[in-house]
Design a protein with these regions (language model features):
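Active-site-facing alpha/beta catalytic cores
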Residues: 3, 8-15, 81, 94-259, ...
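N- or domain-start disorder-to-order transition segments that initiate the globular core
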Residues: 4-8, 12-56
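Glycine-rich phosphate/diphosphate-binding loops that line cofactor/substrate pockets in enzymes
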Residues: 52-60, 266-271
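Conserved phosphate/anionic-ligand binding catalytic regions in large, soluble enzymes, centered on
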Residues: 63-76, 338
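Internal helix-turn-beta structural module
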Residues: 319-347
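Short acidic, Gly/Ser-rich segments with clustered Asp/Glu that frequently serve as metal-coordination loops
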Residues: 69-72, 271, 279-285
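Conserved, mostly hydrophobic/aromatic
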Residues: 67, 276, 342
Length: 347
């Protein structure tokens, strides 16, 4: 038998398992694309300071993270942002708005549209290098052309460095919240980070994730051993649950909110904050139900002082047109993933 070294075997395995589709991507080169000017960065920092005050409770405005399920079309997202910016000006004394610009989408079985990062044209080829450029461009345009800051989902923790200078709010999704790497990277984010309950609805799992995100952690991150500073602005998002038989279990009702408040009280968590996701398994993806869900939660805030104290944010899926379409149908401003509220109902 021919003698082979472990290193040669490893090299052969690497060649079999992964095929390089691009050269090594340089972080500094990527961040030089769509880089904020000093003036633009200062405007973002001012908005970020306001958001931090909302999260800490020193600013009593209600937080609204709102926008399309997926940011699939740059011009439609920008048109939505322009309208939203005008609405923010009208309600600025009561509500602080951050726009959802979700550029990568988790897929239950790996199939389907995975977001702007993967496909700049939903019907086109996959190119993640061009996707990074498109993602940065979209986040910057929303900020610089409308003054709104943006939210995105941290689907891939290793990509955080590529967008952290442009994004003001990060979310860890229901499929990712049990993953240790997501929890540990969340503990190093300098911005508010919402942790969704897992699809099972298990609140213990959710608060384990919250605890991990609010502690200092040591981990391997992008080729280095690092220690995080902890994230005191990490908080929970209630998005409902899904049973094995496919039925949904909402968790925005009065009793559900009290259970989550009780979980907050039992732990030594910083800046207690509950956000209610009005779509997904809370609405059963019946997008019009989002209006009723908001009304119910607001009523419960009036009824119970603790709910008013803890529940201080909504995450709402909204776009220019009601509902959804299949990729390629070409309806401007209508979702190609989960159905969303149209603009008139959003207003």
């Amino acid at each position: 038998l021919k003698s082979v070294t472990i290193r040669e075997i490893a090299k052969e395995r690497k060649n079999l398992s992964f095929k390089a589709l691009s050269q090594h991507i340089n972080l500094d080169t990527v961040k030089s694309i769509s880089k904020l000017t000093e003036e633009e960065a200062a405007k973002k920092a001012a908005r970020d300071a306001e958001l931090k005050a909302v999260m800490e409770g020193t600013d009593d405005r209600f937080l609204l993270v709102i926008g399309p399920c997926s940011a699939d079309n740059e011009e439609a997202v920008l048109e939505y942002a322009r309208r939203l910016a005008k609405l923010q000006e009208e309600v600025k004394d009561k509500i602080f708005i951050v726009q959802r610009v979700y550029t990568n989408k988790p897929r239950t079985n790996g199939d389907g549209y995975k977001g702007l990062l993967h496909q700049q044209d939903p019907s086109g080829e996959i190119n993640l290098v061009r996707g990074m450029v498109a993602v940065r461009k979209m986040h910057k345009r929303v900020l610089t052309e409308t003054g709104l800051t943006t939210a995105d989902e941290m689907l891939y923790p290793e990509n955080l460095e590529f967008i952290e200078d442009l994004v003001s709010y990060h979310a860890v999704g229901a499929r990712s919240v049990e993953d240790q790497q997501h929890r540990f990277v969340a503990s190093g984010i300098d911005h508010p980070t919402g942790l969704k309950n897992p699809t099972s609805g298990n609140i213990n799992v959710l608060f384990n994730a919250l605890y991990a995100s609010q502690q200092k952690q040591e981990l391997m991150y992008n080729g280095m051993e690092v220690e995080t500073s902890s994230n005191p602005l990490a908080h929970v998002i209630l998005r409902g649950a899904l049973k094995e038989n496919g039925s949904v279990v909402p968790n925005y009702h009065y009793e559900d909110l009290l259970k989550v408040i009780d979980a907050y009280k039992k732990g030594n968590y910083k800046n207690p904050f509950i956000m209610v996701d009005t779509n997904h398994d809370n609405s059963g993806k019946k997008y019009n139900e989002q209006i009723r869900i908001v009304q119910e939660v607001l009523t419960n805030r009036q009824w119970n002082e603790e709910i008013k104290q803890y529940v201080r944010g909504f995450m709402i899926e909204s776009y220019l047109e009601d509902g959804r379409q299949e990729p390629g149908e070409g309806i401007f401003g209508q979702s190609i993933t989960d159905p969303c509220l149209g603009w008139e109902k959003t207003e």
